[in-house]
């Protein structure tokens, strides 16, 4: 009779991270998947990271997860998004070679101790005394375990839609998990339906690249992993094109044939990744929409047209593609499609991602209502860790909102639930000044060491990095200038008699360690990576105290009542999305408003300020 400590169901991004985390803790772990050869497949866009998402990848890496290292091994166009903005909202991103990414993930898993890969389909759970104690497989029968992690992605009762054609599938070419979906309903788990979509795939050699503008990779690629010294893969460029009036007219003329608009799909799709037909219907006044043509690999003929997700019939897809500059003669290798799938209301989970009604069952990824590789992987790591700790009779791990974006996401899911696919944005975090992508290891690697999921190699690397940073910080805090000395060096400060350290000067706008080294030569010995960390830390030091005060003030304002007469439309700065949700929910207090899906700390501050101003004006008139 087969048995393991932990069973992971599903081999997508959540499942791979869950399996690795569980095994790193020391639990005997089985990863169950339809096809071992498909482990680590990038089912949709060939990219990792981005705004908010890049923070999650850095946090996964700080916890010794796989995604950051795999992305570095496969990255073929690294770009740091929001480079001109502050470090807190910069988002590392890379296009990845699909094959290289998959190979990297599979290599990590096959080399992982305590991990067994099993090729089969789970058709039911074993439940004893209201606790999950294993699974039943389609071919191999019963496997017992101390905990099970479900990471079914879009496979749970998944259906693909292309025009009026519909069939059961987890993704193109792979079967759906239908029996397991039916069994979950029998356990009185609240399920819903969501949908996502993907564009057609095009042949690279049939695109007229010479007519299109190009987007270059960064000259100096910034890796995801704190262990990566250098990006080895050659960096490529992608091209940019646009839809036009002719494209839009073809889509409008055939909108009734779209699965999304014909009534065939009941699940809501991701708001921030709309289909092209959604864009035309909702933003009809636009004369065009930007499309990024992203090659899927160095030696792959496939191109991903980012921005053209659709569920229109294949003949319509071919027609509108021919109207787009550079794509007039493009060959469609695979049509775009929508996929609809079951998800579990995440409000049924604890913050360890365990289902409250079925102890021993953990959920991670799209089954919890999220969208995106990075969101799935982050949940997978946490669920796998907690499943292993449960079996080892250790306390469950909660990650707070003040510690990591992972904590923000899990808290949002569990406390607010979802009505549409959830994706991460930096605006969701109250503590984003301290939750930067550059300091993810400082925040999380010591915790991961306590939890037992960090390798000796990573821990040694982290300690050496911190020692260099501590030494550099100490040097900077012990080099001083008086106001007169500062002026003599061209530094403009108040003549208040206060001596300022090199660390203090780094908080000044446009100040760099390189400039300070002109009159403090000992600073030249600090390596470039430590310089970058120190400069960012010093820049934010002044603001972190204020952030803490703002948070304390916000907590006091939670009990502030929202008048029923409040004109939400009059509050400038609120998105139309939030205005409509607030009007629909009609929250009675700020605490109620906090629970609205998509509500951000910045939006709450706008509402509070508006209410307080209205009260002051009313008091003056009285």
UniProtKB/Swiss-Prot annotation:
Compartment(s): Cytoplasm
Keyword Amino-acid biosynthesis: no
Family: Belongs to the MnmG family.
Database matches in Gene3D superfamilies: FAD/NAD(P)-binding domain (3.50.50.60), GidA associated domain, C-terminal subdomain (1.10.150.570), tRNA uridine 5-carboxymethylaminomethyl modification enzyme MnmG/GidA (1.10.10.1800)
Gene Ontology cellular component annotations, sorted alphabetically: cytosol
InterPro entries on file: FAD/NAD-bd_sf, GIDA_C_N, MnmG, MnmG-rel, MnmG-rel_CS, MnmG_C, MnmG_C_subdom, MnmG_C_subdom_sf
Keyword Signal among record annotations: no
Subunit structure and binding partners: Homodimer. Heterotetramer of two MnmE and two MnmG subunits.
Binding site for FAD: 10-15, 122, 177, 366
Required co-factors: FAD
Protein keywords: Cytoplasm, FAD, Flavoprotein, NAD, tRNA processing
GO BP annotation list: tRNA methylation; tRNA wobble uridine modification
Name of the featured protein: tRNA uridine 5-carboxymethylaminomethyl modification enzyme MnmG
Chain's role: NAD-binding protein involved in the addition of a carboxymethylaminomethyl (cmnm) group at the wobble position (U34) of certain tRNAs, forming tRNA-cmnm(5)s(2)U34.
Listed NCBIfam families: mnmG_gidA
Any GO MF annotation of the entry: flavin adenine dinucleotide binding
Chain residues that bind NAD(+): 269-283
UniProt xrefs under HAMAP family: MnmG_GidA
Pfam hit, one: GIDA
Organism per entry: Bartonella tribocorum (strain CIP 105476 / IBS 506)
């Amino acid at each position: 009779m087969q048995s393991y400590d932990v069973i992971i169901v599903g081999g997508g991004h959540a499942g791979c991270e869950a399996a690795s985390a569980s095994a790193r803790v020391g639990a005997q772990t089985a990863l169950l998947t339809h096809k071992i050869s498909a482990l680590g497949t990038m089912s949709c866009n060939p990219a990792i990271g981005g705004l908010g998402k890049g923070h999650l990848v850095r946090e996964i890496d700080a916890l010794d997860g796989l995604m950051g290292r795999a992305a570095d091994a496969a990255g073929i166009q690294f770009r740091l998004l929001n480079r001109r903005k502050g470090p807190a909202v910069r988002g590392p991103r890379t296009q990845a070679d699909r094959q290289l990414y998959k190979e990297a993930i599979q290599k990590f898993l096959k080399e992982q101790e305590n991990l067994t890969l099993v090729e089969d389909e789970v058709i039911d759970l074993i439940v004893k005394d209201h606790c999950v104690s294993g699974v039943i497989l389609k071919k191999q029968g019963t496997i017992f375990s101390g905990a099970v992690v479900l990471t079914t992605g879009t496979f749970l009762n998944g259906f693909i839609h292309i025009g009026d054609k519909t069939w059961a599938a987890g993704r193109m070419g792979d079967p759906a998990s239908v029996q397991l979906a039916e069994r979950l309903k029998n356990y009185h788990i609240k399920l819903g339906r969501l949908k996502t979509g993907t564009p057609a795939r095009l042949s690279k050699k049939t695109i007229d690249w010479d007519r299109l503008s190009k987007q270059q990779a960064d000259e100096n690629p910034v890796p995801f992993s704190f262990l990566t010294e250098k990006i080895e893969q050659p960096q490529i460029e992608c091209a940019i094109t646009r839809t036009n009036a002719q494209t839009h007219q073809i889509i409008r003329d055939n909108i009734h044939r779209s699965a999304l608009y014909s009534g065939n799909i009941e699940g809501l799709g991701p708001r921030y990744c709309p289909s092209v037909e959604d864009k035309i219907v909702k933003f009809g006044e636009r004369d065009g929409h930007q499309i990024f043509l992203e090659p899927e690999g160095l030696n792959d003929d496939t191109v991903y047209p980012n921005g053209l997700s659709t569920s229109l019939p294949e003949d319509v897809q071919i027609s509108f593609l021919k109207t787009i500059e550079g794509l007039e003669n493009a060959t469609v290798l695979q049509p775009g499609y929508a996929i609809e799938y079951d998800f579990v209301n995440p409000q049924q989970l604890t913050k360890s991602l365990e289902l409250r009604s079925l102890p021993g069952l953990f959920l991670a990824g799209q089954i919890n209502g999220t969208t995106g590789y990075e969101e799935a992987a982050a949940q997978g790591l946490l669920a796998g860790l907690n499943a292993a700790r449960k079996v080892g009779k250790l306390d469950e791990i909660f990650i707070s909102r003040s510690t990591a974006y992972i904590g923000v996401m899990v808290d949002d899911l569990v406390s607010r639930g979802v009505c549409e696919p959830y994706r991460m944005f930096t605006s969701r975090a109250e503590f984003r000044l301290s939750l930067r992508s550059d300091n993810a290891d400082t925040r999380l690697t010591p915790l991961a060491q306590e939890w037992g999921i960090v390798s000796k190699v990573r821990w040694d690397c982290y300690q050496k990095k911190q020692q260099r940073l501590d030494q550099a910080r100490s040097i900077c805090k012990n080099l001083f200038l008086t106001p007169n000395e500062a002026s003599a060096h061209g530094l403009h400060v108040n003549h208040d008699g206060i001596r300022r350290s090199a660390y203090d000067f780094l908080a000044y706008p446009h100040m760099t360690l390189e400039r300070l080294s002109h009159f403090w030569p000992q600073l030249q010995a600090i390596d470039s990576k430590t310089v970058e960390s120190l400069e960012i830390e010093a820049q934010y030091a002044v603001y972190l105290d204020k952030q803490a005060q703002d948070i304390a003030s916000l907590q006091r304002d939670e009990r502030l009542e929202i008048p029923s007469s409040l004109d939400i439309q009059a509050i400038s700065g609120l998105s139309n999305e939030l205005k409509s949700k607030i009007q629909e929910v009609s929250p009675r207090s700020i605490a109620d408003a906090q629970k609205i899906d998509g509500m951000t700390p910045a939006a709450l501050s706008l509402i509070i300020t508006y209410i307080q101003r209205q009260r002051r004006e009313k008091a003056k008139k009285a």
